[in-house]
């Protein structure tokens, strides 16, 4: 597979006299004059794109440059999204948190999960609060229950210093599997509808002649 850089010389920007040309399907055409390659690109409704300027002669390819750039931008977006999904966000709660703050902070966690991030939920203990870890566990249970539709806890809560931590991971709905199950059920139902009725049963159900 040829690696095409973000910046390319395209069509009239290519000033060399000869190039090694690759066709739109990846086939090797060979070394030809750039002018002939340009004519070939016009005839096919494609662009002539230099993909390897350091080669001798430079390597060019026939392709739809606009479509290629669009696909490349989509791939870059997916890569950025994948990198973001590997980031772990952090939201901190106090042991003595009121309902308003709990709702606000839980909303932040929900947004991070919706964006595909993992979230470290931290319960911060003060003074003697540390002697009652069950208070922190209760808050973490509330968080997990409030976000059960979008996230799931990874492992058990753990203590680190004066903090109790729990990782929430985005929840992925098994939609494709459900569709396949429904499709199988429909096929089974269709098969049941076309199953022939045994002759003996049909005769038994038929009304008797008087």
UniProtKB/Swiss-Prot annotation:
Record field: compositional bias (Basic and acidic residues): 176-186
Subcellular location: Cytoplasm
Main location: cytoplasm
Annotated SUPFAM superfamilies: Translation initiation factor IF3, C-terminal domain, Translation initiation factor IF3, N-terminal domain
UniProt superkingdom: Bacteria
Pfam annotation, one family: IF3_C
UniProt record, GO biological process: ribosome disassembly
A molecular-function term among this protein's GO annotations: ribosome binding
Biased composition (Low complexity): 187-210
Keywords: Cytoplasm, Initiation factor, Protein biosynthesis
Matches recorded under InterPro entries: T_IF-3_C_sf (IPR036788), T_IF-3_N_sf (IPR036787), Translation_initiation_fac3_CS (IPR019813), Translation_initiation_fac_3 (IPR001288), Translation_initiation_fac_3_C (IPR019815), Translation_initiation_fac_3_N (IPR019814)
Ranges where the record places region Disordered: 169-210
Coiled coil: none
GO cellular component terms, A-Z: cytosol; membrane
Oligomer and partners: Monomer.
Known function: IF-3 binds to the 30S ribosomal subunit and shifts the equilibrium between 70S ribosomes and their 50S and 30S subunits in favor of the free subunits, thus enhancing the availability of 30S subunits on which protein synthesis initiation begins.
NCBIfam families: infC (TIGR00168)
Family stated for the protein in its record: Belongs to the IF-3 family.
Protein name (database record): Translation initiation factor IF-3
Organism: Deinococcus deserti (strain DSM 17065 / CIP 109153 / LMG 22923 / VCD115)
């Amino acid at each position: 597979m040829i690696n095409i850089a973000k910046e390319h010389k395209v069509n009239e920007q290519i000033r060399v006299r000869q190039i090694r040309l690759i066709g739109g399907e990846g086939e090797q055409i060979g070394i030809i004059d750039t002018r002939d390659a340009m004519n070939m690109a016009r005839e096919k409704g494609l662009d002539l794109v230099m993909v390897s300027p350091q080669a001798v002669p430079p390597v060019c390819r026939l392709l739809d440059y606009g479509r290629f750039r669009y696909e490349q931008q989509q791939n870059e977006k997916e890569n950025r999204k994948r990198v973001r999904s590997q980031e772990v966000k952090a939201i901190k709660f106090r042991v003595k948190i009121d309902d308003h703050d709990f709702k606000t902070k839980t909303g932040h966690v929900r947004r991070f999960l919706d964006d595909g991030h993992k979230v470290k939920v931290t319960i911060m203990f003060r003074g003697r609060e540390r002697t009652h870890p069950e208070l922190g566990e209760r808050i973490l249970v509330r968080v997990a229950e409030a976000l059960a539709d979008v996230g799931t806890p990874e492992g058990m809560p753990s203590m680190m210093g004066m903090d109790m931590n729990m990782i929430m991971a985005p929840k992925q709905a098994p939609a494709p599997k459900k569709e396949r199950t429904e499709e199988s059920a429909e096929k089974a139902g269709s098969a049941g509808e076309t199953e022939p009725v045994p002759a003996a049963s049909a005769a038994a159900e038929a009304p008797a002649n008087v």
